A protein has these predicted regions:
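Cap/insert and terminal regions of metallo-dependent hydrolase folds
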Residues: 71-146
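Core dinuclear metal-dependent hydrolase active-site scaffold
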Residues: 12-82, 147-165
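A mature extracytoplasmic/lumenal domain signature
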Residues: 31-33, 64-66, 116, 184, ...
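Extracellular adhesion/carbohydrate-binding repeat motifs centered on closely spaced tryptophans
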Residues: 165-206
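Short, polar loop/linker segments at the starts of domains and inter-domain junctions
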Residues: 38-44, 99-102, 188-190
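Binuclear metal-dependent hydrolase catalytic cores
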Residues: 1-26, 117-133
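Short hydrophobic beta-strand that contains or immediately precedes a catalytic carboxylate
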Residues: 61-63, 87, 202
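A short, compositionally biased
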Residues: 14-16, 143-146, 173-174, 205
Length: 206
């Protein structure tokens, strides 16, 4: 791009060059520090970039592989602000998406690029308490969608995902299946529902 189109290649970020417009969207880059080059970190995920996309008054935060092992989420909690949509950090694995961080961002929608089974119970509970509507890559594949698409506009946030369907997830930490509907745990669901391990019966339980 630099050679063919004359695009400027920026590798050193400052407060002044980490934000730019892309069409009608404001793009803001987070976790751009370079301390890891001198102090070292145990994993490259610790310096994963986060990207906030804002259109009008609506926004999304794409958290890449960000985690909180070095306190990155603690810092972002006071920097990013509330968002409409959150792509969860580090595939939803333990050590990421901490309760205080999620509470600060308070997303209406969350998407996990990983399996629900690896999602810590505390994370799932934090999302449920906030009313954040959940979906994952497994759901997208099961529905035969090419991709999960979230659209930000001046009028609001929409998605191509069908949240109305009841869905069942298995939590390794809890050792139990959970039923979701509308992107949230549904404690009143009663009936048969098919999961990875076969058909399951729920009787007013999630």
């Amino acid at each position: 791009a630099e050679v063919e189109y004359g695009a400027q290649l920026i590798q050193d970020f400052t407060y002044f060059n980490r934000s730019f417009m892309l069409g009608s969207a404001l793009i803001q880059l987070y976790n751009t520090g370079t301390d890891y080059q001198t102090t070292g970190v145990f994993d490259a995920n610790c310096f994963s970039l986060g990207v906030k996309v804002t259109v009008g008054t609506h926004s999304a935060f794409l958290a890449g592989d960000i985690n909180n092992f070095t306190g990155v989420e603690d810092e972002l909690a006071s920097q990013v602000g509330s968002v409409d949509f959150l792509k969860m950090g580090h595939h939803g694995c333990p050590g990421s998406n901490t309760a205080a961080y999620l509470d600060a961002l308070s997303p209406l929608y969350v998407f996990q690029t990983g399996k629900y089974s690896m999602l810590p119970t505390q994370t799932a509970q934090s999302l449920a308490n906030m009313g954040s509507r959940y979906a994952s890559t497994d759901d997208v594949c099961a529905d035969g969608l090419d991709a999960y698409v979230v659209t930000l506009s001046a009028t609001g946030v929409t998605s191509n995902f069908d949240y109305s369907k009841p869905r069942v997830y298995y939590s390794e930490e809890a050792g139990a299946y959970r039923c979701y509907q509308g992107g949230l745990p549904n404690a009143s669901f009663t009936g048969w529902i098919r999961g990875d391990g076969g058909w399951l019966w729920f009787d007013c339980s999630s």
